[in-house]
Amino acid sequence: RLTVHQTHFFRHVPSLDLVAEQWLPAYLARGEVDAIHAWSVGCSTGEEAFTLAMALDRALDRLTAGKAYFGITATDISAPALAVGRAACYPRAKADEIPVDCQARYCEPDEEDSFRIVDALRRRVGFVQFNLMDIARAPLKRLDLVYCQNVLIYFARERRVALLDALAALLKPGGLVVLGPGEVLGYTPASTVRLGGPQTLAFQRT
């Protein structure tokens, strides 16, 4: 049983840019997509899931004038961490991790020393308890995007490869799995191609 709670908003901007600026425009251009279904794996207290929601919301607003829907399932093994994510309330100091334009659009004061994510964005993220070691029983199928950063690093390489294979198998054709840079080196899952540059690690389903 592995629990990891250290997380931040906008932790790895190059990965977010890969999703919003490179993958998503090309994926939408296929003409077969009217909604993006994403999985934030090992979401801890929700910062990464809400960061991904901000990135998708801004990008879809720009690319589709907000006509394309998106939803994120955020999972973690820790019930206390998930409770924080569901509350969507964070210490005021954490707002400094969020770009100013996103603060204005997606954050609102809660109490003197805290802020919360606005309801419109919070409703796009559902928090569910799930143990990644039970990946064979994952309730999610045919996903557009799997975002799994700084989770696989805690496993031995053989287990990392097996988990990456399982995550990639859940993608629709053209879907993307995003890992933290360096989490799985020298390996590409079957039926995928590497996408992005040296600062990112992502694989697109063919």
Where do the model's predicted regions map?
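Conserved AdoMet
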Residues: R1-V41
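Core SAM-dependent methyltransferase catalytic element
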Residues: G186-T206
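A short glycine-rich, Lys/Arg-flanked "PGG" loop and its adjoining helix->strand segment in the class I
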Residues: V161-P173
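Conserved class I S-adenosyl-L-methionine
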Residues: V33-T51, G71-T73
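Extended basic-aromatic, gly/pro-enriched interface segments that bind polyanionic ligands
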Residues: V41, R62-Y147, V151-V161, L185-G186
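Conserved beta-strand signature within the Rossmann-like core of class I S-adenosyl-L-methionine
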Residues: P173-P181
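Conserved SAM-binding loop of SAM-dependent methyltransferases across substrates and taxa
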Residues: T45-T64
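A structural alpha-helix within SAM-dependent methyltransferase catalytic domains
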Residues: A20, A53-D57, A168
